[in-house]
Amino acid sequence: MTTLNQAHCEACRADAPQVSEAELPELLRQIPDWNIEVRDAVMQLEKVFLFKNFKWALAFTNAVGEIAEAEGHHPGLLTEWGKVTVTWWSHSIKGLHRNDFIMAARTDEVAKGAEGRK
């Protein structure tokens, strides 16, 4: 079985299924530090990454941007001094798809190698 951080995103259309209530616990177990947030009735995955300064936060933001471009799946990114908030959800289905969990796991992999983490 492929782990989330090794998986690749699949094309997600408006008729793609959202992650089911039955799938949710197992997927969350694989990304334990991520939180579910609900905004405008849309379930999203969110995590805050802390850095020693803005330079390292920006470098991490750019690294996440690179994996997002490579997979064709893009997060919400809020870059602040010493902090980056990453939010994954699937716009086309207005909720969570397996792709979001894949990208959250891949974001964690990027964070492991990021310089300047607190």
Swiss-Prot record:
It is an enzyme of class 4 (lyase). One of its GO terms (biological process) is tetrahydrobiopterin biosynthetic process. Disulfide bonds: none annotated. It catalyses: (4aS,6R)-4a-hydroxy-L-erythro-5,6,7,8-tetrahydrobiopterin = (6R)-L-erythro-6,7-dihydrobiopterin + H2O. One of its GO terms (molecular function) is 4-alpha-hydroxytetrahydrobiopterin dehydratase activity. The keyword Lyase applies. InterPro entries: PCD_sf (IPR036428), Pterin-4-alpha-carb_dehyd (IPR050376), Pterin_deHydtase (IPR001533). Its EC number is 4.2.1.96. Keywords: Lyase. Transmembrane segments: none annotated. Belongs to the pterin-4-alpha-carbinolamine dehydratase family. NCBIfam families: PRK00823.1-1. This is Putative pterin-4-alpha-carbinolamine dehydratase. The lineage of its organism: Bacteria, Pseudomonadati, Pseudomonadota, Gammaproteobacteria, Pseudomonadales.
